Swiss-Prot record:
It comes from the Eukaryota. This is MAP7 domain-containing protein 2. Residues 1-11 have a biased composition (Gly residues). PANTHER family: MAP7 DOMAIN-CONTAINING PROTEIN 2, MICROTUBULE-ASSOCIATED PROTEIN. The gene is MAP7D2. One of its GO terms (cellular component) is midbody. Belongs to the MAP7 family.
Amino acid sequence: MERGGGGGFGTGSRPEGTARGTCLPGKIAEPGAVRTSQPNYRPQGMEGFLKSGERQRLAKERREEREKCLAAREQQILEKQKRAKLQYEKQMEERWRKLEEQRQREDQKRAAVEEKRKQKLREEEERLEAMMRRSLERTQQLELKKKYSWGAPLAIGPGGHDGESENTPPPPLGLAASTLPPDAGTTAAAAESTNACDKLSTSTMSLPKPTEPPMSKRLSSSTVAISYSPDRAPLGPLNPSYKSSPTRNIEKKKATSTSTSGAGDVGKEALAGGEASLVEKVKRGQRTATSLPVVNFGSPLRRCEFSGGIPKRPSSPVISKTATKAYPQSPKTTKPPYPGSPVKYRLPALSGQDMPKRKAEKEKSNKEREGTLAQQAAGPQGEDALEKHVVDKHASEKHAAATGGKAENSAALGKPTAGTTDAGEAAKILAEKRRQARLQKEQEEQERLEKEEQDRLEREELKRKAEEERLRLEEEARKQEEERKRQEEEKKKQEEEEKREAGEEAKRKAEEELLLKEKQEQEKPEKEKQEKAMIEKQKEAAEAKAREVAEQMRLEREQIMLQIEQERLERKKRIDEIMKRTRKSDVSPQVKKEDPKMGVQPAVCVEKKTKLVVPNKMEINGLNTCQEINGVDHAAPETYPQDIFSNGLKPAGGLIHLDALDGKSNSLDDSTEEVQSMDVSPVSKEELISIPEFSPVSEMIPGVPLDQNGTGNARALQDLLDFTGPPTFPKRSSENLSLDDCNKNLIEGFNSPGQETPLNTFC
């Protein structure tokens, strides 16, 4: 494993080679000065020890090198991790920086948007404050103008209000303050009524009155909320349009805290805006007054009863209560559409000497009124809530209609009320107010009708669009349904067509199969006849062929029998010739050459003839004769080429050996001693094929006489016997030995022991 590990780094093989080339000889050369022998001659144990030490050293080197490589690799990995960590931290810092910059930009954008919004709000507030300031200035200017217009009568007022400052309201304020009970609710109501009177005086008495200064005195100290002079009475409801601005509540809050400016502030601007402010205030009063059934408690204080022939105002709490509920008098807080109801509260002209009586009557009425305050205790809270909100338009219209009817009734009764001294003037004022209310109502009704018509048209348009959308959706749904039905019908038709085609195809296939079956049934007898005829022909051909083969085999057997007989005769002749040559060595060489020629030629001819006639494979009594002949034929040329036997002699392989044996058996008469010493044994086919190597003929060299060869024939026979080995059957005595026995032994060597040898008869 260590060697493999070192090889993994590519360094183990190199030190090992160098150590084998250089280190080992050096270690051996250290003990002696000169190396006298080769390294191969060192002791075996020493060499193994050196090899193990070298292997350990190399393994140690490989381990060290591997550890170094691992350490270097770990160092590289650590450095790579450190670089990756630094890069990651850098990327995170960059990302956080970008996120922080983006957040700062968003904060800046948000701050800029917020600053713009605040700037717009500040501008809007400044615009509203400026508008409120201008409205307040106009209101203050109107108040100053009113106070200056009422300045002379206030200086010598009969009610004992001499020496009041500019900011003090008209005499009704004093009266209300002196007659109210000390409880907090009543005080608040009285204060509101006082402010209402102040604002009403501001809005109605801004213009100077050239006539009747005593009348002005009486009106300033009376409880009448609004009075009209004969010349200025129709000036109030000139403009039917009224302004619904948010300045009313602010004026109510700031009116008491603002002080009047000097006389220099009253100029052309105050005079120019006087009439516009008057019209606006009056119309606002007409709009909102009807929504408050009970406004303040100051209205009964302003009703005075006069003694003598002057008609007195009724001081009944019930009457005053109904009057306050039906006709509120505070134009600042409630702004009634028909302030004062001049028809109902009209009073005759009062003289200056009746003022003390009026005060006494007021004190009496205040005492009587204290009993009614308990019943109206829940009133201030509802009044305060109603004073701070703008009432709905439709409620104002209904209440306006109701007050109009009451005004007509009061006019029919002919009760004198304060505010004007002329009944015709009051009728004109009432008619003008009714006309304005009717015009306003008609205008509102027209606007309502237009709005309703517009709403109706919008609803109809929406309904028409919805109907069109519904129709469109229905049409689309109908088209989709028709398309779906059409697709289903097409699909159904296609399926039916496919089914019909499949049925036709199946029917056609069934018909074709039926026709084919019928055709096959018709052709079946003919095929059977043809097959029978063919079988018969084949049988006849086979029989003819068998007869031919049998005939051929018979002829071949006959030829083979003739060939065997001829070969036997030829062998016998050759053996005789060989035996003669061995006995008679004094025969001339010429005669010896001619005799083998004459003995061999017939055998060669017979072999050639047999070769042409005998087939490739023919079996006679278990012997493959064709193979034997062919084997003998092929073995002879391989062993004895033509250049050796140029004298015309051809060796016949095992035939020569058999002839020699036969010759010896036939020559028993001449040399019985040699024959008796020979043991003839059956040999196998392979031994017969190899016998020519030891035959006596192989010892004969062409062109050399037999006497020069010496006694080679006897030696050849001895060698042959040694090669073939001892006999495998018991020896026969010389008395029983005959030619027939020898032939029989030879034939049995070629055949198997269990087969009969029909060739024995020929021997």
